[in-house]
Regions:
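Alpha-helical transmembrane segments and their membrane-interface junctions
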Residues: 27-37, 99-123
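Cytosolic juxtamembrane helix at the C-terminal end of the final transmembrane segment
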Residues: 70-79, 135-159
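Cytosolic juxtamembrane helix and N-cap/initiation of the first transmembrane helix
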Residues: 1-27
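Hydrophobic alpha-helical transmembrane segments of multi-pass integral membrane proteins
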Residues: 21-28, 58-68, 97-108, 138
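Membrane-interfacial segments
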Residues: 36-40, 76-80, 110-118, 150-157
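Transmembrane alpha-helix entry/boundary detector in multi-pass membrane proteins
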Residues: 13-17, 39-64, 87-91, 124-132
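Loop-to-transmembrane helix junctions at the membrane interface
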Residues: 71-99
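Hydrophobic alpha-helical transmembrane segments and immediately flanking/interface helices
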Residues: 44, 114-142
Length: 159
């Protein structure tokens, strides 16, 4: 009975930590989407600085990273080979989260940065570049976690 309760507790903690990461990713994407559109329409124009946006992004990134690293180091994946459909959905969501990160990276570094003018605020650009790198890493970590879950859920399936 104690073992059953421990496994149930591990499942709840695992799902809670994964949910924190997924909700954080949705928040990042929803927050950055208007900027993404602005960069696509007006490459080279520096976006206006809003202190609250940077703070909210950093809080979301730190929260996602705390959940990821705690889960990775302390909470094993409690699901094994139970559903090929859930396995595929998890793998798909993992890839989908990183597609957005890849699209944002490509837009910023291959379209926006080459068009920047000499009057660009380099300190602001560096700060935003650091936040972008942190955001891409958080999305990458979420991708890894979803792929680990998908692999575990599909471990008993024939290829």
């Amino acid at each position: 009975m104690a073992d059953l309760n421990a496994r149930r507790g591990t499942r709840i903690i695992y799902l809670l930590l994964l949910s924190v990461q997924v909700i954080g990713a949705f928040f990042l994407i929803a927050t950055v989407l208007p900027d993404f559109r602005q960069l696509a329409l007006y490459p080279g124009e520096q976006l206006p600085y809003l202190r609250g946006d940077d703070f909210a992004l950093v809080v979301a990134i730190v929260t996602m990273q705390a959940a990821y690293w705690y889960r990775l180091c302390r909470v094993p994946i409690p699901f094994q080979g139970s559903s090929i459909i859930l396995s595929h959905m998890s793998l798909f969501l993992g890839r989908l989260s990183f597609i957005f990160g890849g699209a944002l990276f490509a837009l910023v570094f291959f379209r926006h940065v080459p068009e920047l003018s000499d009057s660009t605020d380099t300190a602001l650009m560096a700060r935003r570049g650091l936040i972008l790198a942190e955001m891409l890493f958080a999305l990458f970590c979420l991708t890894l976690d979803l792929e680990r879950l998908g692999t575990a859920l599909g471990s008993n399936q024939q290829s």
